[in-house]
């Protein structure tokens, strides 16, 4: 199918990168990163028996940062290690084998290998690209899983991802409950507002091969996630950056922690109480970075808006209410919401 591959670009342009990967000066990480300082976003012990304390920590981190890391989340380290191992093995396969899972051109689904989400940014005659290859799979609920796009090699890919999804489901249930309670709502309110048991878990494996000029390129351009919440597992290669007070900082890597991003739909449902985090990804000259974000998304036809219990004469709705699919269409195509 001839899927575009950054790995192929790297092999054919040793020591340099093509112009379409070189960002403008106001984006280049070599210029825009605050060097020598790693941003220590809040670290939250998810096993703390003091629920009131946990609610306060989650609420403050979701409001002030939009990003935090949770530890002691009860997902066994071996489950995370297996998830990482099978993802890495897939991307190390020959290009032709990976392309067997490419998204068909006429498919309405995002799932598959080598898919792109956002329209690439055009500057003059040059279309800018991120230094990254992708694989998208829906992993929960079982009713939306399409094994057509799940790699059969390595053979343990399915088992590792299903095991991770099962454990992640428990984390999601608890996190949504705490986020609801932090807004003064009943524990199930935000989950219901996001689609209830039909909330979809979209796994995206980001594969960032070594880049000869990491000072000029980005893996993923600055953005906020469209999801309600994104739960991310990185490998140990630095790359995640967050924007704080208008400046870009590396986010500290913590082994076996889950990185939480508040997404656009959570900001909307909370009527602005929780903040969708602006973040981006840099790349490394010598090492491959891989990350496993799971986007928790409402079904496309599910209507999302500020939660009715958070809106009154004093607190007017700050966001429009619309189908999630319409929101996605507008954001991908850079149309007004």
UniProtKB/Swiss-Prot annotation:
Pathway: Secondary metabolite biosynthesis; flavonoid biosynthesis. Its EC number is 1.14.11.9, 1.14.20.6. Binds 1 Fe cation per subunit. Binds 1 ascorbate molecule per subunit. GO terms for molecular function: flavanone 3-dioxygenase activity; flavonol synthase activity; L-ascorbic acid binding; metal ion binding. It is found in: Cytoplasm. Its cofactor is Fe cation; L-ascorbate. Its main location: cytoplasm. Residues 198-298 form the Fe2OG dioxygenase domain. PROSITE patterns: FE2OG_OXY. It catalyses: a (2R,3R)-dihydroflavonol + 2-oxoglutarate + O2 = a flavonol + succinate + CO2 + H2O; a (2S)-flavan-4-one + 2-oxoglutarate + O2 = a (2R,3R)-dihydroflavonol + succinate + CO2. InterPro entries: DIOX_N (IPR026992), IPNS-like_FE2OG_OXY (IPR044861), IPNS-like_sf (IPR027443), Iron_ascorbate_oxido_reductase (IPR050231), Oxoglu/Fe-dep_dioxygenase_dom (IPR005123). Keywords: Cytoplasm, Dioxygenase, Flavonoid biosynthesis, Iron, Metal-binding, Oxidoreductase, Vitamin C. GO terms for cellular component: cytoplasm. Fe cation binds at residues 223, 225, 279. Coiled coil: none annotated. Belongs to the iron/ascorbate-dependent oxidoreductase family. Catalyzes the formation of flavonols from dihydroflavonols. It can act on dihydrokaempferol to produce kaempferol, on dihydroquercetin to produce quercitin and on dihydromyricetin to produce myricetin. This is Flavonol synthase/flavanone 3-hydroxylase. It comes from Malus domestica.
């Amino acid at each position: 199918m001839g899927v575009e591959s950054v790995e192929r670009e790297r092999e054919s342009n040793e020591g340099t990168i093509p112009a379409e990967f070189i960002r403008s000066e106001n984006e280049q990480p070599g210029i825009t990163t605050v060097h020598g300082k790693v941003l220590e976003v809040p670290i939250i012990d998810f096993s703390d028996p003091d629920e009131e304390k946990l609610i306060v920590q989650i609420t403050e981190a979701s409001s002030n940062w939009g990003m935090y890391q949770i530890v002691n989340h009860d997902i066994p380290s071996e489950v995370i290690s297996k998830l990482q191992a099978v993802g890495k093995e897939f991307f190390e396969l020959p290009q032709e084998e990976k392309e067997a899972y490419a998204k068909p051109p006429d498919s309405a689904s995002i799932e598959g290998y080598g898919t792109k989400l956002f329209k690439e940014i055009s500057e003059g005659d040059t279309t800018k690209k991120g230094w990254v290859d992708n694989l998208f799979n829906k992993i929960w609920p079982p009713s939306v899983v399409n094994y057509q796009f799940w790699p059969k090699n390595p053979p343990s890919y399915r088992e590792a991802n299903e095991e991770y999804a099962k454990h992640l489901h428990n984390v999601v249930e608890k996190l949504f409950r705490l986020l609801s309670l932090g807004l003064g709502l009943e524990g199930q309110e935000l989950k219901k507002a996001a689609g209830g048991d039909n909330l979809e878990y979209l796994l995206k494996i980001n594969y960032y091969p070594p880049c000869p000029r990491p000072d000029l390129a980005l893996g993923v351009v600055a953005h906020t996630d469209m999801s309600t919440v994104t739960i991310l597992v990185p490998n140990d290669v630095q790359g995640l950056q967050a924007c704080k007070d208008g400046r870009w900082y590396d986010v500290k890597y913590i082994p076996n922690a889950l990185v939480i991003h508040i997404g656009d739909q959570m900001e909307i449902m909370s009527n602005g109480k929780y903040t969708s985090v602006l973040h981006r990804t840099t790349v490394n000259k010598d090492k491959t970075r891989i990350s496993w974000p799971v986007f928790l998304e409402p079904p496309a036809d599910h209507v999302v808006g500020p939660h009715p219990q958070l809106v009154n004469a004093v607190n007017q709705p700050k966001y429009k209410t619309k189908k999630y699919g319409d929101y996605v269409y507008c954001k991908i195509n850079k149309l007004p919401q």
